[in-house]
Amino acid sequence: MARLQDQYREKIAPALIEKFGYTTPMQVPRITKITLNMGVSEAVADKKVMDNAVADMAKIAGQKPVVTKAKKAIAGFKIREDLPIGCMVTLRGVQMYEFLDRFVTVALPRVRDFRGISGRAFDGRGNYNIGVKEQIIFPEIEYDKVDALRGLNISITTTAKTDEECKALLTAFRFPFKN
């Protein structure tokens, strides 16, 4: 079992029950999944770019990503239908908690000029989204072997009903919010 999973069961869940006054343990918000998404627009011109992006994502997430394809053709972007345009990974269970631990304790402090993550990126339904500008903040990526800096989107899906509950949950997981 992951370190953060133990911490959730032993400390975070009881603290949230006390703070919000839940009547049953099933009402306590928890993280259900983390989705990593990387859009690779350069893959339209060069197929090797997609292979490098998939390899980077596999190192970051610890599992093989799914290549996402264009749903319809867009002439302005030179995209045809079913053309590979990105990759994504959905993490659940132990791998999710391991990634969360590495992200909060190792990757976020490596961001240049880091002053905390935005406290406004909630979607109104208890989910949180973070945009990472470059993949080299993750320790699994070797700086010398990176062909291009690529950003990725991290979506944290929770069972929280409100943004306030979600922020309390993520703060308990030691997310460094700035506002």
Curated annotation (Swiss-Prot):
One of its GO terms (molecular function) is rRNA binding. InterPro entries: Ribosomal_uL5, Ribosomal_uL5_bac-type, Ribosomal_uL5_C, Ribosomal_uL5_CS, Ribosomal_uL5_dom_sf, Ribosomal_uL5_N. GO terms for biological process: translation. It comes from the Bacteria. GO terms for cellular component: ribonucleoprotein complex; ribosome. Keywords: Ribonucleoprotein, Ribosomal protein, RNA-binding, rRNA-binding, tRNA-binding. The keyword Phosphoprotein does not apply. The keyword Zinc-finger does not apply. Pfam families: Ribosomal_L5, Ribosomal_L5_C. Part of the 50S ribosomal subunit; part of the 5S rRNA/L5/L18/L25 subcomplex. Contacts the 5S rRNA and the P site tRNA. Forms a bridge to the 30S subunit in the 70S ribosome. NCBIfam families: PRK00010.1. This is one of the proteins that bind and probably mediate the attachment of the 5S RNA into the large ribosomal subunit, where it forms part of the central protuberance. In the 70S ribosome it contacts protein S13 of the 30S subunit (bridge B1b), connecting the 2 subunits; this bridge is implicated in subunit movement. Contacts the P site tRNA; the 5S rRNA and some of its associated proteins might help stabilize positioning of ribosome-bound tRNAs. Belongs to the universal ribosomal protein uL5 family. This is Large ribosomal subunit protein uL5. The lineage of its organism: Bacteria, Pseudomonadati, Pseudomonadota, Betaproteobacteria, Burkholderiales. The gene is rplE.
